[in-house]
């Protein structure tokens, strides 16, 4: 005997198939109307069944009106090639108007070739493969707190060739993130070969299981198995294991033409219209089959209960069932208007008691990490402060400080820097003031660049007319870079931070700061915790140093500071980090020779000061224990703002090779490194003497 649950399930699967047709039609129309008529069609179509099951199967708790409301489930599209399908679904759900689907990929559109938070409902930017799962894992970590929620992610199987995926897989299992569900679109194709992987990932189920995951392998050419797997994750008892649903399908599944199995293609209009027409015919057949099934259900008893539930399910899918004696049966798609409202502003300022901050004595030396530990004991009392280390917590001081207050917010991912950075982004996207830390050369450029792209899109989405985000919805994410310049000394070139500032200087929106003293570090931390500082790359000294600044010092980004100055100065030495101490010592030596020298600490680039110093007519010495970060900006500013430049008054001392090319540095003691590059106080003093004698 049939029961109501069975009848509802059969009807639900038929409704999902109808929705499948709607989404494929929207996606094809999107390709037809794109500025380049292009689409990653194979991966977009293979993902439709998992997508539709997830968003219309009743397994996600979403607030389309307020996508940033805490406590709702989150979704990350790691395989960015499926953005067209996701955009079709989000337009259908009401995250934005369907008009957004037209003219996609164009300069005027917010719908790009890969997803990003300029598009309503999208939390992060994805595209570089392997990173989305890592961020989704970060969301799952947050979802273990209150209010609790689940984190979903869709990856491709080719994407699993990325090492970062397995960093996240290992760590998610270790952290028992049973609120994390990953759907793998196993379409067995990728860019270079759409019919097979470049190298096969055999025994994928066993691979995930070996890392402690619960794995469900399903036929993703049908809705029943995928929906059952999602319901098992969502509603069955949990035991600490993350869930991976392996969705076995093929590239372009659900399309009619063989062209639909391609990677990124431009579809001729004639073929697109042919494909759309055939999809519409399929929809008509599916709708007719559902309506026959629905009409056969009795109006009372079990059939009546099933009808009522199916009517509610259809409404949730934006489908309208017309049925009754006075009407011909019909099943129409409801084109909803945009529902998403502008997010409420976020107050990002961290609350703390200043009396709890460390008091530094100018007569003593302190390590930056030690000061950070003591400061974080005060800052971390605000639950929005979180830190993530990668097996170098002893050099950052973060874990010891935050862990003293709340160990659950003092995270250490082990030797997995890329995973660390993505987890940090997840926390920052949810409104936390997040800090991640490792040695300067160990930050991942590809990850940092993607995060910065997402940051830019979040700012654009907050500032643009009709944007869905608001003030305070950027990212407050600090990259605490330890052991910069010569601080790693005998560890050798792989650990030496003499080039990181210049490499990362090309990352848009990244605020680079090279701190010189413990009091300055404390002031920089206070500045960051005021909130809305964006992406900050903060370099700190490893070994202890003296205190240069008074307790009331207030850091401002883009400002240099005179540590020594007089009207008699014939030369000004500019430096940052520990180089400032060497410049001060050089100034002492010069004073004994009767030469007055000013000293500037420039932790971040002060363009106005650069111009003022040049216009003063004094000799300028830019001395840096790296490949010339300040010097590169000095040249850039002068050539942009001044027509005639007297280069004879400018002297650069740094770690560039004699021909001006970048180079790496071999192991040596700190004093040996100073001598090697002419950065010892005596050497700098001699350079100054030669400069002023010309």
Question: What are these regions, as identified by a protein language model?
Answer:
Residues 1-152, 166-533, 544, 662, ...:
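Thiamine diphosphate
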Residues 79, 158, 222, 416, ...:
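Short beta->alpha junction loops/turns
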Residues 79, 155, 184-186, 219, ...:
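Glycine-rich, histidine-containing beta strand-loop boundary motifs that form or position
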Residues 81, 158, 186-188, 391, ...:
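Residue-level signal for short, function-critical loop segments
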Residues 158-165, 222-227, 515-522:
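Active-site glycine- and acidic-residue-rich loops that bind
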Residues 160, 196-197, 367, 415, ...:
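Residues that cap or flank secondary-structure elements
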Residues 164, 199-200, 419, 496-499, ...:
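Residue-level preference for nonpolar/small residues embedded in alpha-helices
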């Amino acid at each position: 005997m049939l029961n109501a649950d069975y009848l509802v399930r059969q009807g639900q699967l038929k409704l999902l198939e109808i929705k499948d047709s709607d989404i494929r039609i929207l996606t094809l129309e999107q390709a037809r109307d794109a500025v380049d008529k292009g689409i990653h069609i194979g991966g977009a179509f293979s993902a439709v069944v998992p997508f539709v099951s997830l968003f219309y199967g009743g397994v996600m708790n979403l607030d389309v009106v307020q996508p940033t409301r805490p406590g709702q489930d989150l979704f990350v599209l790691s395989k960015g090639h499926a953005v067209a399908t996701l955009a079709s679904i989000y337009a259908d759900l009401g995250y934005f108007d369907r008009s957004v689907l037209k003219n996609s990929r164009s300069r005027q559109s917010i719908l790009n070739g890969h997803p990003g938070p300029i598009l309503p409902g999208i939390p992060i930017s994805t595209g570089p493969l392997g990173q989305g799962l890592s961020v989704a894992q970060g969301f799952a970590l947050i979802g273990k707190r209150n209010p609790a929620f689940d984190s979903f992610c869709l990856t491709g199987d080719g994407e699993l060739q990325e090492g970062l995926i397995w960093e996240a897989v290992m760590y998610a299992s270790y952290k028992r993130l049973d609120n994390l569900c990953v759907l793998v679109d196993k379409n067995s194709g990728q860019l270079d070969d759409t019919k097979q992987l470049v190298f096969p990932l055999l025994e994928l189920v066993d691979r995930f299981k070996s890392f402690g995951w619960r794995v469900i392998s399903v036929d993703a050419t049908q809705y029943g198995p995928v929906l059952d797997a999602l319901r098992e994750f969502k509603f069955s008892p949990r035991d600490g294991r993350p869930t991976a649903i392996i969705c076995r399908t093929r590239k372009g599944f659900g399309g009619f033409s063989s062209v639909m199995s391609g990677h990124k293609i431009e579809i001729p209009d004639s073929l697109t219209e042919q494909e759309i027409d055939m999809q519409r015919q399929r929809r008509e057949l599916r709708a007719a089959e559902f309506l026959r099934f629905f009409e056969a259900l009795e109006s009372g008893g079990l059939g009546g209960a099933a009808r009522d539930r199916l009517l509610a399910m259809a409404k949730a899918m934006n489908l309208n069932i017309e049925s009754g004696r006075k009407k011909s049966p019909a099943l129409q798609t409801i084109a909803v208007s945009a529902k998403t409202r502008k997010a409420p502003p976020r107050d990002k300022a961290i609350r703390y008691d200043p009396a709890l901050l460390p008091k530094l004595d100018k007569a003593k030396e302190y390590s930056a990490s030690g000061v950070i530990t003591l400061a974080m004991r005060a800052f971390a009392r605000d639950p929005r402060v979180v830190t993530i280390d990668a097996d170098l917590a002893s050099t950052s001081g973060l874990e010891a400080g935050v862990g003293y207050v709340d160990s659950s917010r003092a995270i250490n991912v082990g030797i997995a820097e890329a995973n660390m950075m993505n987890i940090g982004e997840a926390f920052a996207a949810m409104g936390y003031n997040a800090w991640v830390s490792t040695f300067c050369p160990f930050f991942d450029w590809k990850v940092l660049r993607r995060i910065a792209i997402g940051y830019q899109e979040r700012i654009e989405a907050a500032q643009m007319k009709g944007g869905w985000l608001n003030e305070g919805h950027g990212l407050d994410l600090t990259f605490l870079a330890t052991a910069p310049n010569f601080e790693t000394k005998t560890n050798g070139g792989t650990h030496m931070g003499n080039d990181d500032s210049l490499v990362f200087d090309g990352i848009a929106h990244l605020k680079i700061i090279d701190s010189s003293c413990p009091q300055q570090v404390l002031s920089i931390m206070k500045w960051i915790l005021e909130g809305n500082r964006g992406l900050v790359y903060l370099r700190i000294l490893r070994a202890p140093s003296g205190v240069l600044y008074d307790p009331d010092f207030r850091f401002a980004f883009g400002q240099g500071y005179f540590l020594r100055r007089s009207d008699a100065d014939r030369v000004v030495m500019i430096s940052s980090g520990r180089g400032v101490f060497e410049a001060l010592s050089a100034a002492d030596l010069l004073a004994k020779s009767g030469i007055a020298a000013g000293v500037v600490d420039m932790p971040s680039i002060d363009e106005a000061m650069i111009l003022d110093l040049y216009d003063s007519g004094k000799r300028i010495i830019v001395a840096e224990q790296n490949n010339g970060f300040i010097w590169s900006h000095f040249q850039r500013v002068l050539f942009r703002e001044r027509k005639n430049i007297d280069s004879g008054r400018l002297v650069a001392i740094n770690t560039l090779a004699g021909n001006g090319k970048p180079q790496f540095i071999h192991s040596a003691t700190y004093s040996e490194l100073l001598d090697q590059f002419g950065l010892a106080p005596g050497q700098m003093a001699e350079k100054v003497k030669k400069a002023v004698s010309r």
